[in-house]
Amino acid sequence: MSGFPSNRVLGSGTVLDTARLKYLLGQRLCVDSRSVHAFIIGEHGDSELAVWSSANVSGIDLEDFHGLCASCQDVSFREIYEDVRDSAYKVIDRKGATYYGIAMAVMRIVLSIIRDEHSVLPVSCYIDGNYGLNDLCIG
């Protein structure tokens, strides 16, 4: 579509949902979300998945951190995941669209590229033959 080679094209992937997950975890665990390391993978939407097995707060497993944290709220990781997954619907109900959130996610991606930050972001890319998959964008 763009005329660019596929290795020069990327999509926003789950950058927005990952940011929402990190924000909610930080809020509920009483830490700066920049200290939370967790990802949403898959599609942006109903079938996205939170990768709990690698999620941590500054290297400490989420469950362990929650157990050590005296000021933390009672945390249900399932509820946090559901809040992230369903957040777009809540925004649409209130504002009619979600364009500000995705605009912020795209800005994050673009700034990372422009500044050569070497950031790890859950963007999507075109797959044609990798992993036995063809003609597909995944994140």
Range-by-range predicted roles:
Residues 26-139:
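Long, compositionally biased stretches enriched for glycine and/or charged residues
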Residues 1-22:
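Rossmann-like NAD(P)(H) cofactor-binding subdomain of soluble oxidoreductases
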